[in-house]
Amino acid sequence: IMTSPVLVTSDSYIQDAIITLFMYDADVIYVIDEDKLLLGIMSRKDLLRASLNSNIASTPVAVCMTRMPHIKICHKNMNILEAAVLLQDYAIDSLPIVDQENERQILGSVTKTALLDYIIQQARSTEVNREEE
């Protein structure tokens, strides 16, 4: 259920981040540095708030993003239930999936939508198997 994360660099402007968010129909944008390491995250809510309080064409996302280490993360070997609990407990829409040795190396992301799609697919599959028995 890991998906490709939507990325912008820390020197991108809020206006560019908003456009990127809607182009990819994403819930969040991950902010990376020049070495492609995770620096922060911006949700739709963060971008909306930033657009109300600043000049979006000239304000870098780095000014408004939630920074590491204040970001909830998961590792690729984390089970689905653990990821779901993090999403639910912290009321967030997406988690970055990071490398076990380097928690700034983003590998992908998991969203509430992808997780729910997976659960529904598994439940339907279980129903079909029961009906066939």
Predicted stretch roles:
Residues I32-D33, V98-E101:
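Core beta-strand residues in small-molecule sensory/regulatory alpha/beta domains
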Residues Y30-V31, K112:
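Conserved SAM-binding loop
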Residues Y13, L21-V28:
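Long hydrophobic segments that form regular secondary structure
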Residues I1-S4, I18, L38, S43-D93, ...:
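Tandem CBS (Bateman) regulatory domains
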Residues D27-V28, D93-L95:
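Short loop/turn microsegments at loop-to-beta-strand junctions
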Residues V6-D11:
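Signal-transducing coiled-coil linker helices
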